[in-house]
Amino acid sequence: MSAFDHLGDMGPIDIWDGVRARTVDGEGCSFGVVELDPNSVVPEHRHPNEQLGMVVSGTVSFRVGDEVRELGPGGIWRIPPDVPHEVHTGPDGAVVFDVFSPPREDWAALERAEPLTPRWPS
């Protein structure tokens, strides 16, 4: 396996309705470029992975535990393991970067679609 890849050559995985990710797994973490359609919802959920992320484009309303923030490009979040969280996108949708530790085994088990042009970079 090569140490390098290109986003446009990676098939996305469908995470929820209107939410797809292109992921790379390392030994200690997973990295994802996640595309969220306009007005989409990532329902409340939790996982055993620590999660760090940043909005690249668009806007999201992000709830982590009891705290809610409206985030645009450059907005960053930190989610400890097993803390409930959810996301709602605005009318333009969003592209975000996510890093998980340990790696997301549940995402790694999902089937990848054929590669298609990513929304970012444009």
Tell what function each PLM region has.
Residues 81-106:
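Ligand-binding loop in jelly-roll beta-barrel domains
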Residues 49-50, 54-60, 65:
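Glycine- and acidic-residue-biased ligand/ion/polar-headgroup-sensing regions
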Residues 1-28, 32-33, 109-122:
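A short, N-terminal "cap"/entry segment at the start of jelly-roll beta-barrel domains
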Residues 67-81:
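Short acidic-glycine-tyrosine-enriched beta hairpin
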Residues 47-49, 75-76:
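Amphipathic, hydrophobic secondary-structure cores in small proteins
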Residues 17, 32-46:
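Conserved short histidine dyad/triad with adjacent acidic residue
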Residues 30, 59-61, 68, 84, ...:
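Structural motif
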